[in-house]
Amino acid sequence: MKTLGEFIVEKQHDFSHATGELTALLSAIKLGAKIIHRDINKAGLVDILGTSGVSNVQGEVQMKLDLYANEKLKAALKARGEVAGIASEEEDEIVIFDGERAENAKYVVLMDPLDGSSNIDVNVSVGTIFSIYRRITPVGIPVTEEDFLQPGSAQVAAGYVVYGSSTMLVYTTGYGVHAFTYDPSLGVFCLSHEKVRFPATGNMYSINEGNYIKFPRGVKKYIKYCQEQDEATQRPYTSRYIGSLVADFHRNLLKGGIYIYPSTASHPQGKLRLLYECNPMAFLAEQAGGKASDGKNRILDITPVKLHQRAPFFVGTKSMVEDAERFIAENPDE
């Protein structure tokens, strides 16, 4: 059975002028994921559950595990020396790594260290999301915010780790999507799903229907469409919503479906972060034959203007995302 490390080295030839930095960078993320996996599994036995009492730049109270995962991933990436700096959902500003090696590094990493962390207390799946870009500024100097404010189409690699009944790392470098399952007895990620593709059709929709009254008119119409009886299109669809983007996306990737987090009356710009959540998942979706949109525009075409920018998010089976876009276009809010 092929391990993640073996697979990454084998695929290194996909990159022109590859010299091993990206391979080492992905290995650092793999190490961070293994550490987080270990500690999530005993979270109820040590004091890393619950809130930290600290708020992030968006005014949201951070969970203890959010901060813990952020520090572990940051340390793993810094130790490898292949990263010039990071941006994280848990950090107010970019983190610039110091030292000559970091200044000469080609890549920057953006991450959501622990997506869905509020689910930890009740033992529901959570995940880590990461996104890798080649820096814009010249090597040899510290990175700037400009290196992180790139459209998603410029991503070199992206992926996530889902910590569930098993721990899985799923990633793409622009040559398909591959998934690796963690074997705790050996301490390695083993290739379990190669060239993952969204099914051509799906019958699941994932959305927090508790916010229905706040949704745009087109989204309400689409939800009703999902719930209507129609044998020709195999409706009604099944509603499945975990409340963890990674877990919901992962299920829909394997089974077929759409994940929706639209703009609402209370969050007119959307709730999910463009850089840390939408872009990496959009890259994965497109590489797996799916689609990702803000309801009108391709997610990967959006040029961000700030680190913690938000966006409405529609991602999943291509035909389902296109149906949702059609309902939004045909039913504008007055």
From Swiss-Prot:
Mg(2+) 2 binds at D112, D115, E277. Its cofactor is Mg(2+). Binds 2 magnesium ions per subunit. Its main location: cytoplasm. It is an enzyme of class 3 (hydrolase). Mg(2+) 1 binds at E89, D112, L114. It comes from the Bacteria. CDD domains: FBPase. Pathway: Carbohydrate biosynthesis; gluconeogenesis. It is found in: Cytoplasm. It catalyses: beta-D-fructose 1,6-bisphosphate + H2O = beta-D-fructose 6-phosphate + phosphate. GO terms for molecular function: fructose 1,6-bisphosphate 1-phosphatase activity; magnesium ion binding. The keyword Hydrolase applies. GO terms for cellular component: cytosol. Its EC number is 3.1.3.11. InterPro entries: FBPase_C_dom (IPR044015), FBPase_class-1 (IPR000146), FBPase_N (IPR033391), FBPtase (IPR028343), Fructose_bisphosphatase_AS (IPR020548). SUPFAM superfamilies: Carbohydrate phosphatase (SSF56655). Keywords: Carbohydrate metabolism, Cytoplasm, Hydrolase, Magnesium, Metal-binding. The keyword Metal-binding applies. GO terms for biological process: fructose 1,6-bisphosphate metabolic process; fructose 6-phosphate metabolic process; fructose metabolic process; gluconeogenesis; sucrose biosynthetic process. PANTHER family: FRUCTOSE-1,6-BISPHOSPHATASE-RELATED, SEDOHEPTULOSE-1,7-BISPHOSPHATASE, CHLOROPLASTIC. HAMAP family: FBPase_class1. This is Fructose-1,6-bisphosphatase class 1. The gene is fbp.
